[in-house]
Each structure stands twice: as structure tokens, then as C-alpha cells.
Amino acid sequence: MSYSFAEKKRIRKSFAKRTSILPFPFLLATQIESYADFLQADVAPGKRKNQGLQAAFNAVFPIESHSNNARLDFISYMLGTSVFDVKECQQRGLTYASPLRARVRLTIMDKEASKPTVKEVKEQEVYMGEIPLMTETGSFVVNGTERVIVSQLHRSPGVFFEHDRGKTHSSGKLLFSARIIPYRGSWLDFEFDPKDYVYFRIDRRRKMPVTTLLKAMGYSSTQILADFFEFDHFTLAGNKILFHLIPERLRGELASFDIVSEDGKVFVQKDKRITAKHVRDLQQANLTKISVPEEFLLGKILAEDIVDKETGEVVATANSEINETLLERIKQTQNKNSEISTLFVNDLNYGPYISQTLRVDESTDQMSAQVAIYRMMRPGEPPTEDAVLALFNGLFYSPERYDLSVVGRMKFNRRVGREELTGSTTLSNEDITDVIKILVGLRNGRGEIDDIDHLGNRRVRSVGELAENQFRAGLARVEKAVKERLSQAESENLMPHDFINAKPVSSAIREFFGSSQLSQFMDQTNPLSEITHKRRISALGPGGLTRERAGFEVRDVHPTHYGRVCPIETPEGPNIGLINSLALYARTNEYGFIETPYRMVKNSRVTEEVVYLSAIEESQYVIAQANANFDQTGVFTDEVVSCRHKNEFTLASRDQIEYVDIAPAQIVSVAASLIPFLEHDDANRALMGSNMQRQAVPCLRAEKPLVGTGIERVVAVHSGTAVKALRGGVVDYVDAGRIVIRVHDAETRAGEVGVDIYNLTKYIRSNQNTNINQRPIVKIGDILSREDVIADGASTDLGELALGQNMLIAFMPWNGLNFEDSILISERVVSDDRFTSIHIEELTAVSRDTKLGTEEVTADIPNLSERQRARLDESGIVYIGAEVEAGDVLVGKVTPKSETQLTPEEKLLRAIFGEKASDVKDTSLHVPAGISGTVIDVQIFTREGVDRDKRSKQIIADELGRFKKDLADQMRIVEADAFQRAKRLLAGKVAAGGPKKLAKNSTITQEYLESVEKHHWFDIRLIDENTSLQLEQIKDSLVQKRKLFDLAFEEKQRKLSQGDELPPGVQKMVKVYIAVKRRLQSGDKMAGRHGNKGVISKIVPVEDMPYMADGTPVDVVLNPLGVPSRMNIGQVLEVHLGWAAKGLGKKINEMLISQRDASEIRDFLSKIYSDNGKQEDLVSLDDKEILELAKNLSDGVPFATPVFDGAHESEIKHMLKLADLPESGQTTLYDGRTGEAFDRLVTVGYMHVLKLHHLVDDKMHARSTGPYSLVTQQPLGGKAQFGGQRFGEMEVWALEAYGAAYTLQEMLTVKSDDVNGRTKVYESIVKGDHKIDAGMPESFNVLVKEIRSLGLDIDLEQH
């Protein structure tokens, strides 16, 4: 087994018993693939599939004029390249997008010609607006900020059957309904009412009898009855009535007469219930006709019209109920042996629902039914024949107005039981009748209703599909405008671009990416929060559910979530269950349904074949769990295996198993799979744990978790935070900001530059103001392969996710300071900067045009102290590296103010000192309250045409210098490579002449080549023409590369020197970035990975902390009472295993210090790595690599305990024993203050602790004098408004209870909204006279005004 560059530096010991045969899929694939399918940018126009942009264009084009004289056809589209790259767009506040151009053909027909003849064809490329591009990590940059389009889980198009669970009617009767949901178009509902009539609704409007719809579709009453019912046949034979017997239909009926055969044998006596035995007897007797009394016909319903054969008169119409009178008329008019057909109905399983509905239906024929539907859809409009037909045909039969979609058709056909899964995306008459038949069948007790929360009935709409819908909506708006203008095409000699206005398209796209509910500000706190945000699935958003209306069932975990949606990770609060996360191995299929992988089982043997199944397909198979036992050959060892079948957990024999899970972690999401010992945690706490990991703030120095799950490396690499080598090669140069790699020849294609330069991200602000900083982990000369990690990012350590720090934990109470989840922490943790984090604040100063003139950025600010001015350069902008505090000036700016009338004193001063500065006011950018730190970056943006200041020019020069350095490095390596190849080519060849008087026919030696300058090597002439040609090619290639580099430099120079796009009226914008160092302090929120969270109560001196027998003080003291009731035992197991990890590291460190032999260290390592769990291949590492591995392990051997497949208690004890630690995981602790041992043994060990993004610095705040509410004159609330503390109703009660009358009066008046009183308080404090004169609170005046607004005049009596 081969290790990657970073893996071999620190191998994580895994306790996994089962290795997954399927590597982890790319975690951002859903987003990236969906958008790639939407754009199809890399696909040739002729080969593009009908999806995404292509499908949207195809749906709208061709557009024809109303007169059909002109037509606009779409040929293809082309995406340009973005002017700025991602980083430039973020800096400049632009959207990272590319221009979209469509090639369109205008065809004008000849009006005068007798048959359609083309008169003129014009073809042109038309600009269609900008389409945002996705970054490599699956996000979008919109107006300079990174955003994510969250995938939506919505109800799949198709047909659904359900009932009201007996809630509608007081009797509790189940009312069945069916709904046909299209992707686009009108919803069609069918429903039963309590009287068992069947109705339909279109778009939830007024209900109408379903037979109205059937008649509108062209069915007659007789056809409807024939389609929905089976018939009973009777023959009138003289005085006898013969019934054509089908014995099965009589089952369960009460015999109203003796059923007798022709020979007089009685099969069933009168008033007896007909049983299955009777039915069998009748079938065996082969009795086909029996004589029935006339009463048997009474109440039956006629299936067809009965016509008098002599007169042609209709004696009885179809669907009439036979009564005595009607029966007499029928007997009189019908001939001997004539047949009557009636509907076969009963109360049990063949109800007369459609027949009853037909009776209440008032429409008579097709037209009257269509008119009734028209009146329902368009009340008040006169129904003309054309309008009626157009509306009815447009509802469900027109592709423009109605689209069931490919998914909808597949789901529809599958539900109505058809073999064919494809077909028309509009409805047909057969579709509608099939749905009604199934609905009637449900009422008759046949079939089952659908579960709408089943993942086979919910599909994912990813970013590509959502963007396509918006683009299509924009194009539809364009279509209307184009249709209007096309009629003028010929007369005005217009070109295609004159018709198409790109505004509606680009505004639809801009609105979607900028302000849609599904376009969210990316959570960038740490790499995990980024990756989780992109894998999120929301049931909210346009076309989805709303928080208020979503019930318990939708939010609940469903059996089909298994392996598709994580049952653990979901927010707490109103969105619980509506926002979910994709499971680890899940992906979406072509239809948008979530699939999960399984290994196929053949003949009780597990194969290597992997099959992805959706929830629809899965239920029919028997699927075993991933922890099922099987031997080396894959044969199940147990006779009976725990498995899932039809969404139920069950036991099955091993020969019935068809599939087996791919991995134990299959059911959970990325965040949940990062929790070690997840299987020992209560689900509620695991939910909090997975959510809190996303809030972990990156620490100054990231530290890998000693106890992980083995997926840390995958998350770090897939999130894009850690830098990967694009191609293999040798590290040529490394510094803190860039890595230069000389690429292996084998990986360099012809014409490519054989050098990769990685400019690392240094101290960049994230969306959540945390710090994104990358640091190299390679050295010069390191040999790398493709995909190797070469630099760590925020919260990553040697290419592994490292969200927190490993702390030495003791579970014990300590003076009540860890009461109720409080956390006690050692001062050493703070002094060692273990949890110190850097937060970057961005502050912006804007210089605008005002009516009185332009605001000016300058250092010449009135009344500015020398100390403040010293921090500003001559342009008035703060220096990089300046330490600034609240209130300091960052950007000096003055605004012109209107000239006021001067007082005589001011005139005199003006005359003496000649001061003219008073006509401007200071509007400088100051550091806001609560922020102090170091200025780390300044960016200046200047409008085109405005002169740049000195600082701006300096920034551009520095940027160009960095770019030039990159190009120089590239050129250096390219030249070295070219000269190397030239040297190999020339050495030993026969020359025809050359520099330094090289003699003809002399052999070129190494010494000669070294004596000549390298660029003169290309002047050497050779006898061999072939070699000369190769030398010429190397020279041409080098010249070409130089030209390319010069062009790249010129392009960069042009970009930087051109003006910036700024909002209207803005002349200059200065952004200042301040790095704020946040050290750990009381009030900060900390958490483990098991939902064990708390707030720091006190930071205790090291010498007072409890310590172990060897003198090691613990870092953190947690309350043991926080464990049993929360049932998150995982944290205790983590602490035990963490202690073992640290103990083993300590032993390895001792071996290194005593300079033990590499083979001895190798033996000890193999004891750790090869005893149990996953076997590691230490043999493949040489001694040097073993020593480097041991050095990296000396701080602790990292363990991986994968979820549901982790370390057992015995394995933890074994590791503790190997580390020479007590197997109980407990030890004696001593009180740091007294030195006495505590009575009981204490659980001690290492836990990975996170600092959460709920810092006390961001929350703590005190008001001095601040803003007041306009109406009530009370202080505002909240830190953002510099507000006060609310003194509410209950607090007033408290003071009343204490009888603190004066305090209460103070609170309700001068400290709140007594405007005059609070001014007087200030005066009395200044005078030193501490007297309070309380007046009328403003809120009382507001109350008086409110009462007056109700029409009651209220006044206070004046005394």
C-alpha cells in the first residue's frame, strides 16, 4: 500500500475492522457536476445534450411572428472567459461571471409568394448577459462575496394518491384523493366527498364532478360507464328473467332467492350468505344462467340506453335505476330473448361512485362540459367556442403550457403500472382515466396510498436545474417582446440583435444568485462548515415548504433516509428536519433522486461489484448491514443475517441477501462521521456535536485530533482548504507565500510550461471574519506525486482537518466552578496561545461626490493629534503594521460643508491666523468600538479618470512585482529545462561552426559548452540536419514562451492600471483590514465533538490546577455530572483513547531522545499499528522515513475510530497497557492548592476541544450615551445599535417586591425616557449635586396619544 507525501509523515492508526472497497466520492461532486451540466462549456456546440442552457434555448426558440412571416432560430451558444479571476473579483466586489453569446438566425419569408419561400436569412451572435461561474470549490462569487446555492428537496412531479386520515368529516370516514403534479403547469386533483361522489379541481379551484372532465375529454355517458364498470347481463325470456351467472361476483352477498339449477338442485337457500364454498360449487356445476325473480332487477343500474326497436324511442337511458314502472316498460317494449346490461356494483369492493357522480353532473355533452370548466377557470368572461377550446387544450395537452418532465412521466408510468417508463411529457386522456380508476380502486379497498415523505417521491433540484429554471423564465420574458417586434423585421431591415434584449435574462439570473432564498452567504468559519454548506439539502425555498406549514411527518427521519440523508445532522429550532445533509456516499441520479451504493451479493457471497440504488428501487431488495460477518472469500458466516427489506428491519437467511451496505459510515453525513465513538452517543447530543463542529474557530496553530475517525484527511483535501499538487514534480522553491514545483517530464504535455507556481492565501478574511491562511508543509527538494498535499490551510494540520486542540481533561467537580456545564481552564492554555485565534475585520471608507464638491482622502485633517497623524501616510491612509485601537483614524477624509455666517469673533480669528480649514468637516474612518488590532492590508479602488494617489501607485507596483517574480521563476525553470535538453542534444555531436571560433567537424564537448554563454548554444551549427532542426525547435519554443510571459505581464499591468468599477457617485474606496487577536477568556464558549458544550467560568493559575502523580497539571476540568443524563458516553471513551495516544507518543519521544536504533523504533511502531484493526504497511517506509514518522508521532499517536466500526473497550485497554498507563483510564489527582490527593480516582485523558464562534468579545457591551428610539424616547437595544439593557416588566415586579421605590422611579424615568429629567441628571452630576428630579416619562405621552387615536380625549389635571 502506498502512502501520499503527507500520509507517510504521520500515519493514523485505524481500528476499522472493515475496509470500504469504494473510496470516498468527491464531496462537492453534486454541486460541481450539476453546474457543469448546466453550462456544458467544454462540450462542442453540436454535441451538447438537451439540458441546462441548451434546453432553455431549445424550449423558447424558434420564435415566430404572429403572421408567420419571420422566424428567429437558435443555433448555438458560447461562453466567453471571465475578465477577472476569483481573487480579483473578491477584492473588487465584482461577480465572477462569463459573458454568454447566442448565435441566432433570422429567417424572413416572402409574403407575396404562393407557397412558403425564404426571402432573406441573417445570422448573428447576440449578447445574452453574464452567467456566474462556479469556483473550483463549488461556490459562486457574487458582488465580491462567496455564496452557495443550496440544493432543494421538493416533491417529485408525477401522480400521488393519499387520504385525509379521517380528519375532514366528523364520521372519521377516509376520503381518498389523487393529485397529478407537473414540473410546470396546472395541478389536477381528484377527490371523494363524504357522499362518495368523485370531484376534480384544477389548481385548487372550485370542485366539479369528475364526469364533467371526462365528458370534456370526449367521452359519452355510455363510454364512461363501460370504461369504469363491469356489466351484469340479463335475458328476458318470456315471463322468465335469466341472469348470466358469474359465481365469483356473488361472494359475500345475501341470497334474496333460492339459487337453483335447471334440474332443481338448490345451491344456496334464500337469506343465506354466499360463501367461497358456494362459489366453488357453482363453478363446478358449470351453472351459467339462472332464473331470477323480477325483484332481483329492481335497484340495478342500466349500463346502456334501452331503445324500443319498433319506434326507435329511448325507453330508458343509461345510468337509470330500474324501478317497477321502468321494468314494466322494458318488458313491454323488448322482444323475446332481448338482453339488458346493468352495472355490477356492490357495497363491498365495487362501489357505484362514478355512476352516482354522473347523476349529479349537469353537463350533457363535450361542449357544455368544456364551457363549465371555462367558467370555473375564468369566471365572468364570456365563453366563446374558440376561447373554450384553447383554454381546455392548453391546460394539460399543450407542451408550452404543461410539462410533466421526464421524471414526472417516469414516476407517473411507474405508479399506474405501465412497463414503458418514457413517453409524452403532456397528459393524455388515458393518463387521466387511469388515475381515476386507481383512485376508485383505492376507495374499493384495492391498492395502497403513497407515502409523500418517501425519498422516492421527493427529488433534489441542484444548482444547475435551479439556474436553468431562472434562465428559462428570463428567456420567456424575452420571447414575448421578440414576437411583437418580429412583424417589423422586414419593413425596418432589422438584425437579430435588434430583437433580443438581454436585460430580462440577466436580471433573472442576477436576482437568483443575489437574493434567492436558496442562494446563501457561504458559511466559511472552517473547512467543515464550507463543505457541509455545499452538501446541504433544503426543503424550504421557492416551490418548497414553509417553516410554519411543515408538519411533524415531513421533518421526521424516514426509513428511506438510510444512506441518502443524514439522520443526525439538522439544525435545532424551527428548521429542524427541513434542512438536511447529504450522507457520505450518497449522490443524485439523472432524475434527481438520491442514490446510495451497495455491494452486490451472489450466491451468499459478497462481490466487489458496486451498484447505486435509489429509494424507489431499494425497497424490493433484501439488504444486509455493513457489519454483517463474512469470511475472506466474502461468504456470510452467520446463517441468519440482520437486514432491511421494504423499509423494515428484519432477519433473513443468508441465501436471501441480495445486497450489502458499502460501509458502516454510509448512513451519516460528513460532520457526523467526524465524531469518534458516535455509536456511543445519544442522537440528540450527536446532532449538537455535528452542528458545533461547524462553528469551531480556526486556532493560531492547528492541532490534529489524537482521536479521529479517519475521514479528516478527506474533508481537508476535498474542501479545497489544503493545497494539492496539480502535477507531480520536485519542489524548487518554498517561502511562506509561494511554492514553486518543477514538474516531472512525464506529466508535462507538449507546449505546456513545466513549472507549477502556487501562490498561497495569506491572512485573508473569510465570510465570518475568521482568518484564512495557508502554510507550506514541503521543503526544497521534496519529490511529490499528483494530488499530494503541499500546504495546510485554516484548521488543517499535515493535510488533516484540525478544528480544535487536544487538551488534558479531568472529570471532577472543582469548587463549584464547573457547575451546570461551566468549564474550568488552566492559565497555561491561555499563555501557550492554544486557543488564540485571529479574526480579520474589513472597514471601508468611501469618497463620494457631494453637491458642495468631492470628499477628499487626505492626511490634512482638522484637530487631529500628532499621535494619530503619525499612523497615516502622506495620502491619509494608515500604514500596514500599525497597531490601532478603538477610535483611531484609519483613513483621513474631509467633506466640504456649506459656508455659514461667521460671528465677529470668528472673523477676527480668521483675519489674524488666515485659517481657511473650517469649510470642511472631518468624516474620517475610525476604528469602531470594541476592536483593536494590527493593520494587515489596505486596498485602494479609484474610478476611471481619477488620479491615483501615491499609496495606490505603490500597491500596484508591489502587486506587479509579485507577478513579475512568479513569471521570472517560471521563466527560470523553463529556460533551465530548455538548456538542459539543448545540452543533452549538443554534447558529443559534430559541429559545422559556432561561437568562440568553433572549428568545422570538431566534436562539441561539455567543457566547450560551459565556456560559452547558454543563450549562444543555439548559434552552434551542426552537420546533422535532424539535430539542427531539434535545436531550432527548442529555441523557437523558448522564444514563444518568453513572448507569452511578456503578454501575460502586459495584461496584468493593463488590468491593474485601469480604473475600477465603483457604485455611482463614488470616486474612491479604501478598504482597511485589521487583524484582531482573540485570546481565550471567561465567557467564551467551548465544546467537544459529542455535544458537550459549556462556557468558561474561570481561568485558574497553573499552580492551582489538579495535577497527576508525575506533576503534570490538567488543562481543563469538566463536571462529570454532564455525562450520564446527556448519554454521550463517546466523550469518555475519547478521553481514554486520547490518553493512550499521548502515552504512546511519550514513549516514542523517549526512544528518540535516547537515540534508539531505527529498527527498534520500527518494531515498537509495528506493535501499535499491526496488532489489531487496519494493518499498516510500515515495510514500505525506509529508515529515514520511519524516523521522521516517529518524530511526528512523539506528540501523540493519532488514532482513527470510524463511526459504527470503531475501537472496542478491549482495544482501548490494550493501547493504555502498551502506553504503560492504568487500564481503567483513571488515576489519582492532587489538589494544586493543598497538595493533597483527592479521595477517589479521577478519569483523566486527552479530548479534542473546540473554541466556538460565540466569543464573549462579540457579545459583551456596555452603553454610555447612545441613540434613543424616536417615538418612545427610550434607549435602543442591542450591541449593533450601541443600545442599553432592557429593564422589562418582570424586573419592575422584582423591584416592586423589594419595595425599592426610588430605584424603581429612577429606572422608569431618568434612566429611560424622561427627556428633560435625564438632561438635568447630567447637569447635577457635573455640579456634584446628586439630586434627581424625575418628570413625566415619554412613554406616558405615547400612551395618551394612543388613547386619543381611539377617539377618547384624555388630559392630566393641572394643579
UniProtKB/Swiss-Prot annotation:
Pfam families: RNA_pol_Rpb2_1, RNA_pol_Rpb2_2, RNA_pol_Rpb2_3, RNA_pol_Rpb2_45, RNA_pol_Rpb2_6, RNA_pol_Rpb2_7. PROSITE patterns: RNA_POL_BETA. It is an enzyme of class 2 (transferase). GO terms for cellular component: DNA-directed RNA polymerase complex. Its EC number is 2.7.7.6. GO terms for biological process: DNA-templated transcription. It catalyses: RNA(n) + a ribonucleoside 5'-triphosphate = RNA(n+1) + diphosphate. Keywords: DNA-directed RNA polymerase, Nucleotidyltransferase, Transcription, Transferase. CDD domains: RNA_pol_B_RPB2. GO terms for molecular function: DNA binding; DNA-directed RNA polymerase activity; ribonucleoside binding. Belongs to the RNA polymerase beta chain family. PANTHER family: DNA-DIRECTED RNA POLYMERASE I SUBUNIT 2. NCBIfam families: PRK00405.1 (NF001616), rpoB (TIGR02013). The RNAP catalytic core consists of 2 alpha, 1 beta, 1 beta' and 1 omega subunit. When a sigma factor is associated with the core the holoenzyme is formed, which can initiate transcription. DNA-dependent RNA polymerase catalyzes the transcription of DNA into RNA using the four ribonucleoside triphosphates as substrates. This is DNA-directed RNA polymerase subunit beta. It comes from Nitrosomonas eutropha (strain DSM 101675 / C91 / Nm57). The lineage of its organism: Bacteria, Pseudomonadati, Pseudomonadota, Betaproteobacteria, Nitrosomonadales.
